[in-house]
């Protein structure tokens, strides 16, 4: 499995970074398609460092920029083999099927059995502009698909059948997570946010 360059952030650096608020369901930023990154700036590098710190603090294994209010096509991850960052990611191929229980930091405390391809080929670039090409299966493949969903404004609820979605909405309503959150700026939004469906 190839690893992205500069996606490995030393623990000493991560300790100095800050956590960022994770947006939750009901926030329009989660339903907005993220725009391509055209230039890797110092601010973008700092964002990814803060995203990694936030992800570890949550705790989670992946975090997409829209989950912290930034509408750019970038995500961070660490499924146990060290942190990574992928800019402008896309899946170029997939194979097989795998049902697995999946949760989301933007829908805290809830999980569902979700069917996804078992294997994917993820491509993109790292923070140095080097090509990233990762053949992943099972958990890493699921992680990459989940984060790409966030970059496209797709949530786990969109993978549920109608009855599951109704039950999920009832549960979310009971947990008071489905209420719209206070409006916060959407950084780099490419189009107006669509309402949560």
Regions found by a protein language model. Name each.
Residues 2-197:
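Positively charged
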């Amino acid at each position: 499995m190839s690893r992205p360059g500069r996606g490995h952030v030393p623990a000493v650096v991560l300790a100095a970074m800050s956590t960022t608020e994770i947006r939750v369901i009901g926030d329009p930023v989660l339903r907005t398609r993220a725009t391509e990154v055209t230039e890797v700036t110092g601010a973008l590098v700092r964002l990814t460092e803060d995203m990694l710190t936030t992800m570890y603090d949550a705790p989670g294994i992946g975090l997409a920029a829209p989950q912290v209010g930034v509408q750019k096509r970038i995500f961070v991850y660490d499924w146990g083999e060290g942190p990574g960052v992928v800019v402008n990611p896309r899946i170029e191929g997939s194979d097989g099927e795998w049902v697995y229980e999946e949760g989301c930091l933007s829908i805290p405390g809830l999980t569902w059995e979700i069917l996804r391809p078992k294997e994917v080929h993820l491509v993109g670039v790292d923070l140095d502009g080097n090509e990233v090409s990762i053949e992943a299966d099972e958990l890493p493949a699921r992680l990459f698909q989940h984060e790409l969903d966030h970059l496209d404004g797709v949530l786990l609820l969109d993978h549920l059948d109608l009855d599951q979605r109704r039950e999920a909405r009832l549960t979310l309503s009971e947990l008071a997570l489905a209420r719209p959150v206070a409006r916060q700026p959407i950084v780099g939004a490419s189009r107006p946010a669509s309402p949560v469906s």
